[in-house]
Amino acid sequence: MYKRQDYVTVFQETYNSDKYETLHLAGHKRIFPYRLNAQERALKGGMRGVGFAALLGLDDFRKDAFATGYHAYLLQRKYPHAEIAFSCPRLRPIINNDRINPMDVHEPQLLQVVCAYRLFMPFASITVSTRECERVRDNLVGIAATKISAGVSTGIGSHVEDIEDKGDDQFEISDGRSVDEVYKALLDHDLQPVMNDYVYL
């Protein structure tokens, strides 16, 4: 049965176009304006919501966080019906790649970004990925984050069973808990785990 897709998240990586050019040398992704306008194209195409993310640490994280928030804010004003979400990934060690040196974003800086998003756009959802350790994620969902992943694989093609030539993991996972373990942790923090955020009637 065909399921309609209705949500798009785009990882802009950095809003510094000069830095962006050094990271993407070929393919469609290298065209900065095309990438930048992806969320608006998705909303025009009928998506109910869009997500935004800069990879914090590729460039000045405060500038990228500000640009991410402002980008989302402008689209929220233009498309008030749209659901808006932020992801807050920090640059982590990359397997088989020692050429990208992160501009370190430590836990206090990550907390600053997450709280800034929450204050700036109080109705947006905020995701904290398994790049972060169990302690950080458990604390952030008690402060400002609304979504966390669990039981994740970051290998390219790793969710497809019939692909033989699968890629390496894209980054190291810091929180390896299963879905059941994360579910229980949320209950232990007096939070209500919700496995889906909408129901079609």
Q: What residue spans do the PLM features occupy?
A:
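Proline- and acidic/polar-enriched loop/turn elements at helix boundaries
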Residues: 12, 54-55, 152, 198
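Short hydrophobic alpha-helical runs that function as membrane-insertion/retention elements
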Residues: 9, 50-51, 147-151
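Short beta-strands and strand-loop turn motifs
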Residues: 49-55, 86-90
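Conserved non-cysteine loop/helix-boundary elements of the Radical SAM core domain that shape
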Residues: 3-47, 55-77, 98-107
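Auxiliary Fe-S-binding modules of radical SAM enzymes
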Residues: 66, 77-201
